[in-house]
């Protein structure tokens, strides 16, 4: 499905752009640009979809399955409605199709990612900072200045908090930039005791 989508985007670019760019850059530079663009484009589209899941009532009906967890564990990530899984899968296919087709169209060659153990190098570094603990009761916050750029495990735990004051904040997955630009960023205090799930009215 991803290959078909990539081919469709590539053919569309051929149809709407009358000339084929001839950008001569070294393979290393193209790989670096592609890795960076995929990391950023993938993350901003995740923010947009996550924002919609919280603010569009019919989508919240699916996403609240994830937020109904009263205890966070690494398995909470799998507590997801099948429709939400489908939405994020389609998002991923679209992101990769657009970027891969655009880079092949612009540079006339295949593209590769810079990876560590098969993972985008940006995500690998983020995982080293403890991102896999976001769905846990291990409260890890970063320095305040860093939490303006990266979402810490504590910030995501605030996102899951049952406290109405925390609802609708920290919608970012990796980068906190989108939350900062859209007014949904919440810096995590150094120490805070949290309850999760719903208290009375369902949170958004």
List the predicted regions and their residue ranges:
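Membrane-embedded catalytic scaffold of the fatty acid hydroxylase/desaturase
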Residues: 1-7, 24-195
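Long, intrinsically disordered, low-complexity Ser/Thr/Pro-rich regulatory/activation regions
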Residues: 192-204
């Amino acid at each position: 499905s991803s290959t078909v989508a990539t081919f469709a985007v590539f053919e569309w670019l051929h149809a709407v752009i009358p000339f084929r760019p001839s950008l001569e850059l070294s393979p290393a530079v193209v790989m670096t640009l592609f890795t960076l663009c995929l990391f950023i484009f993938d993350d901003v589209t995740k923010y947009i979809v996550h924002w919609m899941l919280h603010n569009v009532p019919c989508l919240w009906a699916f996403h609240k399955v994830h937020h109904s967890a009263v205890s966070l564990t690494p398995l909470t990530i799998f507590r997801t409605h099948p429709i939400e899984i489908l939405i994020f899968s389609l998002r991923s296919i679209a992101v990769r199709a657009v970027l891969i087709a655009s880079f092949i169209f612009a540079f006339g060659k295949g593209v590769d990612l810079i990876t560590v153990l098969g993972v985008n190098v940006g995500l690998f570094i983020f995982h080293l900072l403890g991102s896999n603990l976001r769905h846990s009761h291990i409260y890890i916050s970063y320095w305040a200045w860093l939490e303006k750029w990266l979402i810490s495990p504590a910030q995501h735990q605030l996102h899951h908090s049952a406290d109405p004051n925390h609802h609708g904040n920290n919608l970012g997955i990796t980068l906190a930039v989108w939350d900062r630009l859209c007014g949904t960023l919440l810096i995590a205090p150094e120490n805070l005791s949290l309850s999760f799930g719903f208290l009375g009215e369902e949170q958004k």
